[in-house]
Structure formats: structure tokens, C-alpha cells
Curated annotation (Swiss-Prot):
Source organism of the structure: Gracilaria tenuistipitata var. liui (Red alga)
Protein name as it appears in the record: Large ribosomal subunit protein uL18c
PANTHER family: 39S RIBOSOMAL PROTEIN L18, MITOCHONDRIAL (PTHR12899), LARGE RIBOSOMAL SUBUNIT PROTEIN UL18M (PTHR12899:SF3)
Subunit structure: Part of the 50S ribosomal subunit; contacts the 5S rRNA.
One of the protein's GO biological processes: translation
Chloroplast is among the record's keywords: yes
Pfam families in UniProt: Ribosomal_L18p (PF00861)
HAMAP family in the record: Ribosomal_uL18_B (MF_01337_B)
Molecular-function GO term, any one: 5S rRNA binding
Biological classification of the source: Eukaryota, Rhodophyta, Florideophyceae, Rhodymeniophycidae, Gracilariales
Length: 105
């Protein structure tokens, strides 16, 4: 059974989705139903015209990117939503990169 995680205005939700090829991260304000910031391997791929693989290194880069975007918007604390995936591998790499950039959850 899946538990619903909801963010607040002061503490939005960092939602992570992992597919076989890509990883996506979104900062969502659930009170207004708005996506505040987003980052994925597809966005980084199109910006840099480089091939980013689906490994932990790519997840670390996405974590750094979403953390920089959230700091630019003044967001210091988030609620981490890993969508019932285990805290391991790419999910863990993304979370650690976000924490290294100074975002708390």
C-alpha cells in the first residue's frame, strides 16, 4: 500500500521518478498544485549535447542541478518523495547530492 506524501508551501516535495533509462526530479508545491522546478537526464542531455548514462553519476548530477535550482528559488527544506522505491543506487546518489548542496530533508 502506497503512502501519500504531501508537501507544504514552506516545505515543498522533492519527487523522484526512476525509469530504466532516465531519472527525473521535480520540486512540487502541493498546496497550489504547481511544479516549481524540474531536472532530468533528458534536460541535461539536450542542454549539453552529451550522452549521460543511467548510472549513479548521472543521478548525482541531477541532484546537484535540482538543488541549485531550488536554492535559487529560496527553498532550503524539502520533503523527499521516492515513490515507494528503495533508498539505494540512483535514488541514494540523487539524495546525497541534494544534501551536499545544502538542502535539508
Amino acid at each position: 500500500m502506497k503512502k501519500k506524501i504531501r508537501g507544504t508551501k514552506n516545505r515543498p516535495r522533492l519527487c523522484v521518478f526512476r525509469s530504466n533509462k532516465h531519472i527525473y526530479a521535480q520540486i512540487i508545491d502541493d498546496t497550489n498544485n504547481k511544479i516549481i522546478a524540474t531536472s532530468s537526464t533528458l534536460v541535461i542531455l539536450s542542454e549539453q549535447n552529451k550522452k549521460i548514462s543511467n548510472d549513479c553519476h548521472a543521478a548525482h548530477k541531477i541532484g546537484q542541478n535540482i538543488a541549485q535550482k531550488s536554492k535559487a528559488l529560496g527553498i532550503k527544506k524539502v520533503i523527499f518523495d521516492r515513490q515507494n522505491k528503495i533508498y539505494h543506487g540512483r535514488i541514494k546518489a540523487l539524495a546525497e547530492a541534494v544534501r551536499e548542496e545544502g538542502i535539508e530533508f
